[in-house]
Amino acid sequence: MVIIFVYQRILKPGRTMLVRQISNLFDLVELFVRARKPLSVREIAEEFSWPRSSAFNIVSTMVERGYLYQPVPRGGYYPTSRWMDLARELADSQPLPESVHGLLVELASRTGETLFLAAPEGTSVVFLDVVESSADIRFIANIGQRLPIHVTAAGRAILAQYAPAERAAVLKRIRYQAYEKDTFMTADAVEEDLQRSATQGWYVNPGVYAPGVAGIAVPFPFRGRRDAIALGGPMSRVEARFESVGALLREAVDRFLKENE
């Protein structure tokens, strides 16, 4: 049996206003990924409880733009290969080289845990790349997933790279809430942890965001970016290894930066 630890908390949108039409478009694309077959307007409308006219308008627009077609007349709609072309172009122009993914693969192999690359996005961090552990009991993260910047190890490894004034401005915008009993509830508490952890060079999350999940992260200032490389896994396996794994991540990242700058 495989047991997977997943960050399931959903970030509140705060001041961000979702554009419904765009959100619906992405929902539809993800539906095609799950269905793996042509879908009719009726099936799409029923899946999302959309008015038939709304589903028709979205589908018609995507057909007109060349993103959907009918493999068989009146047999439903399916994405065209234009999506693949776009994805390939984006991948080819990715600002991070393949060697960064290789570093995650190496560290996942050496530690036996899930490794991920995180980048700042306002008061959140977003996962850019993930290499999942092969262990039966493991932490799983999804590319594009967002987490609070102040309570996660990756987030604090990123905050540590900010100038004091910029960091203070970010911490001031955070809506502090108690995820777990040891969650940082003030900007001062976050700042104290950052100063305490700076001397060792890595940042830890002993279950302060999600129960049973521990994290370790180090800053990854690669080519002017302010990212973090982080490890996630079950508390029972990771907590006792905070120091050894933190030092391993720090050494590996320092070596990578020297070889690739």
Spans of features found by a protein language model:
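N-terminal helix-turn-helix
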Residues: 1-93, 254-259
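Short, structured helix-loop boundary elements
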Residues: 19-22, 76, 80, 93, ...
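Amphipathic alpha-helical regulatory segments at dimerization interfaces
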Residues: 31, 47, 99-110, 116, ...
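Short amphipathic alpha-helical signal-transduction/dimerization elements
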Residues: 33, 155, 159, 163, ...
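Amphipathic alpha-helical effector-binding/dimerization core
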Residues: 74-173
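Intrinsically disordered, low-complexity polar/acidic regions
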Residues: 179-180, 211
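Extended hydrophobic
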Residues: 186-255
